[in-house]
Each structure stands twice: as structure tokens, then as C-alpha cells.
Curated annotation (Swiss-Prot):
The lineage of its organism: Bacteria, Pseudomonadati, Pseudomonadota, Gammaproteobacteria, Alteromonadales. HAMAP family: UPF0260. Belongs to the UPF0260 family. It comes from Shewanella woodyi (strain ATCC 51908 / MS32). This is UPF0260 protein Swoo_2117.
Amino acid sequence: MSFWKEKSLAQLDTQEWESLCDGCGKCCLNKLIDDETEELYYTNAACKLLDHQDGHCVHYQERFTFVPSCTQVTVDNVAQLTWLPDSCAYRRLYLGRELPSWHPLITGSKAAMHEAGMSTQNKVKCETKVRYIEDHIVLWPMRDLD
């Protein structure tokens, strides 16, 4: 059953909600906002807890202890999190779109997501190793395939 087609975001249980996250790691990238234009820019500087090989948080259950500023995506705040990439399942479903063809719930694994270049896998640097974050602005996190 494709629960995400049968239920609204508000009707999902915790397990269903968590499974919507494809584990791309894009939400764990540091972002900048231009002071003059208020335009959002993604960087390839990732949270210190992000595993660069597969894009998951190495301390997911305790992430708020290690990174108090980490944002928890919920049904109550997804509308306000406009910085989530267009490829994000939470954002897509909130906006009435389908899950992308490469999503692990569609394909059964993360392999298609990585092959499509839709994750942070091998594309990021740890934020603690970045000196000038402005030098690390990238466009690929904003890319969306379908």
C-alpha cells in the first residue's frame, strides 16, 4: 500500500512519517541567506553529524543534544520550512506533488537516489573543516528530477 497516497501528512503515524525521509542529507547542509536579496544559497558544508558516504545522521536519535539548532521537520512546521529542497518528500507531498521516481519508498533502496545524484553522497565537506563558507556555495541541492 502506498500510504502517502492514501493519507494526508497529518494522518501519518511516526513510522510512516520517518519513512518519507529519503535520507538525501540535503537538509543537513549549511545554508546562507544574502543580506540584500534574501535569496537562499545551499553550501556543500554539511552538519558535523552527517555521514558523507551515505547521507544519514550518525546520531539521529540524539541529534538535538549534539546540534541544538537541528530542525525537526513536522506536519506542523513543514509549510514554514521553505528552505527544504524541491526534491524533499515532505515538501513535495505538502505541495500536492508525488514522490519522485528515485525515492526509496518507490524503488526499495537508496541506490536509485544516489545514482540519480539526488543525495549528498560524496559531495560534501564537514562544516568544521570549512574556513570560508561563502566559498562553498553549490547549486546541485536545488536540482529536482521529476
